[in-house]
A protein has these predicted regions:
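A glycine-rich beta-to-alpha transition motif near the start of alpha/beta enzyme domains, typified by
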Residues: 1-142, 173-301
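Surface-exposed beta-loop interaction hotspot
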Residues: 146-186
């Protein structure tokens, strides 16, 4: 039975599976992701397909994802470190993390001295401009900031304490928990909210319950991806943190936010201008959890 190489990452707790794209059609990517994300298989909250040589990431549902983008930054850094330590710069990047041969290969050793700082640029599904990745650290722990050029973004006040932020590739409905308490059944509540605000046909929708408590913002994101037919109460959500920061910046005028995620790890969001262009950075930890091969029934189709 054919196998598919994988790596499993934790960008701020948002468990992410990355696979090599290998020319896999989008419909097959969706099916493979649905199988791999189940608890009986690899488990995870989202999946993406990477072409490292082309520096591209396509999420399984074609949505946009900041945390998966940050995981790719760590993957690229790990691949570069592997190639440097083997003294063979001609080897393709995939041979380190996303190949069958890499399943039993060790991770690169962390050299003495200060952590390396590296920068990459990738294309990501759903987002029109390249995403810059600023990577610090060594395997298996890094900090990665995704730096985005912001297009015109619509922020609508739908009701008291409810705002809809439409980002390219994903929309987020933000509910202030001081007004709208967190429901007992978040999945049912999110489904009703998507229907109420006519979001059922969006590629991806996050429903986020947020609050500020003793000066600390925190959020609980539930993300629905249409094409993979998935609903996950996520441990962290980078695009949701960005949407919340943009909404609060419009209301309160702040430009820097530290937003606690359900994992207990914050994501740091900064809004700034670069050459007159509106930009955003989303920064946080990324760790490599596992790498190897997985047997998926649809690989034989």
């Amino acid at each position: 039975m054919p196998t598919l190489p994988f790596s499993k990452w934790s960008p701020g707790g948002n468990t992410t599976l990355l696979f090599p794209s290998n020319g896999l059609a989008p419909a097959l990517q969706c099916r493979l992701a649905r199988q791999a994300l189940t608890e009986s298989c690899l488990g995870g909250e989202q999946a993406g397909f990477v072409n490292i040589e082309a520096r591209s990431l396509r999420m399984a549902g074609g949505e946009f994802c900041i945390n998966a983008s940050r995981a790719v930054g760590a993957l690229l850094a790990c691949a570069d470190d592997c190639r440097q330590q083997t003294d063979d710069m001609s080897r393709p990047h995939e041979n380190c993390v996303l190949s069958v041969e890499s399943a039993h290969s060790p991770l690169p050793d962390a050299p003495d001295g200060p952590a390396l700082r590296r920068s990459y640029e990738i294309s990501v599904s759903g987002w029109q401009s390249p995403v810059r990745l600023r990577v610090r650290g060594y395997a298996p722990y890094w900090r990665v900031e995704a730096i985005l050029q912001l297009p015109d973004i619509t922020i609508q006040r739908e009701a008291e304490g409810i705002h809809l932020v439409r980002l390219p590739g994903i929309s987020h409905l933000l509910l202030d928990r001081h007004i709208h308490s967190q429901p007992e059944d978040c999945f049912a509540a999110a489904a009703l909210l998507r229907e109420r605000y006519d979001l059922k046909q969006e590629a991806a929708v996050g429903v986020i319950w947020w609050r500020t408590l003793q000066g600390q913002m925190d959020m609980l994101p539930l993300v629905h991806v249409r094409d993979t037919r998935s609903d996950f109460l996520e441990s962290a959500c980078g695009s949701g943190a960005l949407a919340l920061a943009l909404s609060r910046a419009q209301t309160a005028g702040a430009k820097s936010f530290s937003i606690m995620q359900p994992s207990g790890s914050p994501l740091d969001v900064r809004l700034f201008s670069e050459g007159g262009v509106s930009m955003a950075g989303v920064d946080g930890p990324v760790s490599l959890v596992a790498k190897g091969q997985v047997w998926l029934p649809d690989m034989t189709d």
